[in-house]
Amino acid sequence: MFQRKTLQRRNLKGLNLNLHPDVGNNGQLQEKTETHQGQSRIEGHVMSNINAIQNNSNLFLRRGIKKKLTLDAFGDDQAISKPNTVVIQQPQNEPVLVLSSLSQSPCVSSSSSLSTPCIIDAYSNNFGLSPSSTNSTPSTIQGLSNIATPVENEHSISLPPLEESLSPAAADLKDTLSGTSNGNYIQLQDLVQLGKIGAGNSGTVVKALHVPDSKIVAKKTIPVEQNNSTIINQLVRELSIVKNVKPHENIITFYGAYYNQHINNEIIILMEYSDCGSLDKILSVYKRFVQRGTVSSKKTWFNELTISKIAYGVLNGLDHLYRQYKIIHRDIKPSNVLINSKGQIKLCDFGVSKKLINSIADTFVGTSTYMSPERIQGNVYSIKGDVWSLGLMIIELVTGEFPLGGHNDTPDGILDLLQRIVNEPSPRLPKDRIYSKEMTDFVNRCCIKNERERSSIHELLHHDLIMKYVSPSKDDKFRHWCRKIKSKIKEDKRIKREALDRAKLEKKQSERSTH
C-alpha cells in the first residue's frame, strides 16, 4: 500500500512538517486530500485502508516492507581538606535554580512575567530550552517553518491559518510559520515505527522508517501540558536554534517537527538516526556483558584510539556551534554523544544550549553531574565549561564509573555532588591502570578547576592525543570498532529477548503446575 504511485518520493532532508487544523462547527474532524502536481488524487478507499492499520500514529512493518529494510549488518567476532561552603551567586532579577521533586521538571523561577520561559534542567528533561536574556518576541523565533500545529486530518500535514480559538502560545507558534513557501510536506502514514530507542520523564524516542525514500529517522515525542505556554515557548525557542544549524559532520541533523495539539497534545521531532546509539547506551551494554561474565571488567571497550576519535568529534562539533552560531552546548555527557557504524560522532540534545549574548552565558542550568565549578559558583560561563564536561566523560568511558562518585537525584543528593565538584581535588584517571602520557595530559588539561588555566577547544584540537591518531588507517580502525559495537548491541538485544522469553515460559509452566 505504501508503494502506490500516489505516494510521492520525497527527500526527507528538505522536509517541512506543516500542519493545518480543519475543524467544523461541530468540532468533528474534516478530512482533506492534497493534490500534487504530477500525481493523481488519493482515492478515498486508500485513505480508509491507511486508517485501518494506523494506531495512535504508530505504524508497524508489514511483511512486504520488511524485505526492503537493509540496515548495515557489519557483524564481527573479533574481537581533602575541610571543604568550604559552596556559595552560588545569583544576580538580582536573574533566573535562579529551583530544585523540584523527581516527578516534576526543575525550573528556573524569575521575577519576570509568566511569558518568560522556565528552564528545564537536562538531568530530568533533555528537551528543555534556555531562555534568552529578554522575553520571547516574534523575532527570536522568526523563520521557524518546520514547527507546526496539529493535523486534524491525520493523513496530511500543511500550513494552517491562524484561529482565534487557539491559546496565545499556540498562536505564537503559528505566527512563526507565516511566510512558509516550501510546499513539501509529509504524510503521517509514511512513518513506520520500528522500535523504541529510549524513554524518560520528558518523553520517548523511537526508531522510524520514512517509507518513500527508505530513510531511517529518530522520532522524539514530547508531551506538553495542556495550554502550558511556558513549555511551548521553551520548545519553540529551542527548535528555532536547532533548525538554523546547518548540517555538520559532528552535529545531529534536524529534519522537522510539529505540534500535535488536539490529539495527544505533544510535540514530535524528527532527526537523524544513529545506529550505534549514545555513548551512555554503549557503556550500559558493556556493563551487562561484564555482569554476564563474557567480558573482563579490566578490559574496557574504549581504548585510546577510540577516545581520541570521540574527543575530536565532540570538540569539532562544539567548535562549529560556537564559531558559526555563538552557541554553547552546556550539556556534554555520554547520553548526548551519538555514534553510527560509519564512524561518525554526533552531538545531540541541545536541551540547555543557549545562544550567547555578549559572548558570555551566565544562566545556571544544565546537568549537575557534569557541571563545571564556575557554573556551580555562579561565575560567568563560557565554552570552557564544555571542556570540563568532556574530561569527566572521558574518565567515565575508560573506567566505567563516574569519577566523582554516585549520587541520588534528590535536592540533598545534588547539593552534596555540587559541594564535591567545588571542594574535592580535580578528577584524574586512576593510578592503578596504565594510560599513555598523551591521554593523561589531555584529561588533566580538561579537568582544571580554574577556568582561565583550562585548555581551550582550539588547543585541545591540536593536542598530541588527537594528532597521534589522524590518519586514514586510524579512521578505518575506528570504523571497524563502531561496526563491532553495533554487532555487540544486536547480540545484547538477542540475549535480553531470549532471557525474557525463558522467564515467560517458566512463569507459564509454574502456573500450570500449581493448577
From Swiss-Prot:
The modification Phosphoserine is found at residue 359. It holds the Pfam family Pkinase. PROSITE patterns: PROTEIN_KINASE_ATP, PROTEIN_KINASE_DOM, PROTEIN_KINASE_ST. The modification Phosphothreonine is found at residue 363. The active site is at 331 (proton acceptor). Keywords: ATP-binding, Kinase, Nucleotide-binding, Pheromone response, Phosphoprotein, Serine/threonine-protein kinase, Transferase. Phosphorylated at multiple sites in response to pheromone. GO terms for biological process: cell integrity MAPK cascade; invasive growth in response to glucose limitation; MAPK cascade; pheromone response MAPK cascade; pheromone-dependent signal transduction involved in conjugation with cellular fusion; pseudohyphal growth; response to pheromone triggering conjugation with cellular fusion; signal transduction involved in filamentous growth. Gene3D superfamilies: Phosphorylase Kinase, domain 1, Transferase(Phosphotransferase) domain 1. ATP binds at residues 197-205, 220. Serine/threonine protein kinase required for cell-type-specific transcription and signal transduction in yeast. It is thought that it is phosphorylated by the ste11 protein kinase and that it can phosphorylate the FUS3 and or KSS1 kinases. Present with 672 molecules/cell in log phase SD medium. Belongs to the protein kinase superfamily. STE Ser/Thr protein kinase family. MAP kinase kinase subfamily. This is Serine/threonine-protein kinase STE7. It comes from Saccharomyces cerevisiae (strain ATCC 204508 / S288c).
